[in-house]
């Protein structure tokens, strides 16, 4: 790409992305934080293990601030194009016994996975490196991709002037914009 993009990966990533956006003088589309990319990957991994289905069939995301205040918009979680509830019903009719997910426990798993890696290995730099490489590949490619990166909010979901992770279209031109997802009022 002909325009250099900045990726923020240092924690607290959302605050660091916000500060860099404000002080750098660069266009906002050139700045993004790793946000909840890893959290979303951990969510898909946990769902894959629980449902015993390949991760590539799972579309589920972690939104908000990376860390303890992140949340999972369950109304937007899908397995091969159907909601989780529809998936349970469908596989049950096939004779498969799939236990419904404890949503609070899954969120706790997502939030604590990084800490468990640090306790076991001393750091989480490998997973962050993979996320950075995926973003670099997207930016250097000729097509856009959707990721839960941290970038400035401009009225999406009624939120202004803060960097948070939501579905974001990213590509060779950097951050193209947020992809709105319907959520319940509770979410």
Located regions from the model:
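C-terminal substrate-binding/catalytic lobe of Rossmann-fold NAD(P)-dependent dehydrogenases
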Residues: 24-30, 40-185
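Short, small-residue-biased leader/transition segments that mark boundaries at the very start
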Residues: 2-4
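Gly/Ser/Thr-rich loops at beta-strand to alpha-helix junctions
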Residues: 8-16, 36-39
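Short Gly/Thr/Asp-enriched flexible loops that form oxyanion-binding sites at enzyme active sites
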Residues: 16-24
